Amino acid sequence: MQGRLSAWLVKHELVHRSLGFDYQGIETLQIKPEDWYSIAVISYVYGYNYLRSQCAYDVAPGGLLASVYHLTRIQYGVDQPEEVCIKVFAPRRNPRIPSVFWIWKSADFQERESYDMLGISYENHPRLKRILMPESWIGWPLRKDYIAPNFYEIQDAH
């Protein structure tokens, strides 16, 4: 069974993989990093005008990294907005995914946090730098193979 967006993407011969539906009936799609930006633009034009959230996670130690986007199609006069979840998997070594900042401005801090915690580089993001950790921090704290330092000196702001 396909959701509306998946059926539309198939009709227009756009590469993706349906991962089924979650417990709330929200369809989840897998998109390749190289196809993500064009499908993001198409999704926006199709009506997914709101990026509800973006997050990232480490799939497994030494495995892929995933960037997850929850998109919502909000229309005037429609009681129940349509939602879709899109997962973009990137290799652990040099993970690069196109930024959707220029489509949905709400991706700004969310993509920066994913970069800061997992090291996913969001290409063409205007301010991709650490947001939670100090600039001098080495490594990506939410990766499953991350080894925390025994000591880290916190510098006073004064």
From Swiss-Prot:
Keywords in alphabetical order: Chloroplast, Membrane, NAD, NADP, Plastid, Plastoquinone, Quinone, Thylakoid, Translocase, Transport
Subcellular location: Plastid, Chloroplast thylakoid membrane
InterPro entries named among the record's database cross-references: NADH_DH_suC (IPR010218), NADH_quin_OxRdtase_su_C/D-like (IPR037232), NADH_UbQ_OxRdtase_30kDa_su (IPR001268), NADH_UbQ_OxRdtase_CS (IPR020396)
Main location: plastid
Database matches in Pfam families: Complex1_30kDa (PF00329)
Gene3D superfamilies: NADH:ubiquinone oxidoreductase, 30kDa subunit
Tree of life domain: Eukaryota
Its membrane topology: Peripheral membrane protein
Annotated EC: 7.1.1.-
Substrates-to-products reaction catalysed: a plastoquinone + NADH + (n+1) H(+)(in) = a plastoquinol + NAD(+) + n H(+)(out); a plastoquinone + NADPH + (n+1) H(+)(in) = a plastoquinol + NADP(+) + n H(+)(out)
GO terms for cellular component: chloroplast thylakoid membrane
GO biological process, one term: photosynthesis, light reaction
Molecular function per GO: NADH dehydrogenase (ubiquinone) activity; quinone binding
PROSITE patterns cross-referenced by the UniProt entry: COMPLEX1_30K
Function: NDH shuttles electrons from NAD(P)H:plastoquinone, via FMN and iron-sulfur (Fe-S) centers, to quinones in the photosynthetic chain and possibly in a chloroplast respiratory chain. The immediate electron acceptor for the enzyme in this species is believed to be plastoquinone. Couples the redox reaction to proton translocation, and thus conserves the redox energy in a proton gradient.
Listed HAMAP family: NDH1_NuoC
Family per similarity comment: Belongs to the complex I 30 kDa subunit family.
Oligomer status and interactors: NDH is composed of at least 16 different subunits, 5 of which are encoded in the nucleus.
Name under which the protein is recorded: NAD(P)H-quinone oxidoreductase subunit J, chloroplastic
